[in-house]
UniProtKB/Swiss-Prot annotation:
Domain annotation Acylphosphatase-like: ranges: 5-97
Annotated family: Belongs to the acylphosphatase family.
E.C. number: 3.6.1.7
GO molecular function: acylphosphatase activity
Protein's name according to its UniProt entry: Acylphosphatase
UniProt keyword Membrane present: no
Organism whose genome encodes this protein: Nitrobacter winogradskyi (strain ATCC 25391 / DSM 10237 / CIP 104748 / NCIMB 11846 / Nb-255)
Length: 99
């Protein structure tokens, strides 16, 4: 199984609709590690790490998001595994503070 790490920027009505909580719940469900956080520009940023298939599924699911979200745009790109250092100790997936 091939492991990948992808950084994802999600734009639209994605703050104030439970997007971070939903992302964390879905990531845990699919066995994906990483983190999610709001950005001051109104977007949500996430880092997904796991099998190629699981990470691809997370990105696909983020295109719809939770019930009250409206996703206008998604960008994703590969990143180095050291980006995972922001995960809180003892957690596989973290919700980080806004930047």
């Amino acid at each position: 199984m091939h492991e990948v790490v992808r950084q994802v920027m999600i734009r639209g009505r994605v703050q104030g609709v439970g997007f971070r909580y939903w992302t964390m719940r879905e990531a845990i469900r699919f066995g994906v590690g990483g983190w999610v956080r709001n950005r001051r520009d109104g977007s949500v940023e996430a880092l997904f790490a796991g099998s190629t298939e699981a990470v691809a599924e997370m990105i696909t699911r983020c295109r719809s998001g939770p019930e009250f979200a409206r996703v206008d745009d998604i960008e994703d790109q590969p990143v180095a595994a050291n980006a995972l250092k922001m995960i809180r100790p003892g957690e596989r997936f973290s919700q980080l503070p806004t930047v």
